[in-house]
Amino acid sequence: MPTIRVQEADFDLGAEIAALRAGRPQIGAVASFIGTVRDINDGSGVSEMELEHYPGMTEKALANIVDAAMQRWDLIDALVIHRVGKLRPEDQIVLVAVASGHRGEAFAACEFIMDYLKSEAPFWKKEQTAQGARWVDARVTDERALARWGIVTDNASAATAQAASANDQNQKDRDA
C-alpha cells in the first residue's frame, strides 16, 4: 500500500527507505528522488520558500499520481513525502521512492511520479528574494517532461511559456 504524507517536518532518507524495504525480500530495486530548495531561481537569489497546499485535496492528488504509476509498472510499493511551510535553501522538499523487483521499472516509475507531481500536484510556492515575495508558476519544461509520458496539461502561464520559447530559440541560435 503506497504511503503519501504531506508534512512540515523534515524526513530521514535512510529511515524512510528502510521502512519501505522492511520484510519484503522480493524487492530487487529501490529508486528515489529528493528535491531540495535552491538558493537561486530565475536569476534571483532565494532566501526562503513557502509551500502551501489544500489539505485533503493534495493528498488525494498525490495518491492518484502514485496509483497511475502502480498501474503502468510492476511496483511493490511507493512513497511520496512532500513538505509544506517555510523552507530555506538546502532544505529537503520532496521524497519520491519506489520499490520494484527490477531497476528499470523502479527508475521509470520514480521519474514518472516526479514529473507528474511537478505539473499536477496542488502545491503553491512563494519565494522570498531581495526584490520581495513572488509566486512560482508551473514551468513549461515540467509540462514537457510530463508530456513524454502521454499526459498533456496546460498549467504553465502564458508568460512562462513565452520565456521558455525564447530560451529554446536562444539555445538553438547558440547551437547553430
Curated annotation (Swiss-Prot):
GO MF annotation list: molybdopterin synthase activity
Keywords noted in UniProt: Molybdenum cofactor biosynthesis, Transferase
Pfam families with a match to the protein in the record: MoaE (PF02391)
Domain of life: Bacteria
Residues that bind substrate: 36-38, 102-103, 118, 125-127
Subunit structure: Heterotetramer of 2 MoaD subunits and 2 MoaE subunits. Also stable as homodimer. The enzyme changes between these two forms during catalysis.
Protein purpose: Converts molybdopterin precursor Z into molybdopterin. This requires the incorporation of two sulfur atoms into precursor Z to generate a dithiolene group. The sulfur is provided by MoaD.
Annotated family: Belongs to the MoaE family.
Record's protein name: Molybdopterin synthase catalytic subunit
Organism (species): Ralstonia nicotianae (strain ATCC BAA-1114 / GMI1000) (Ralstonia solanacearum)
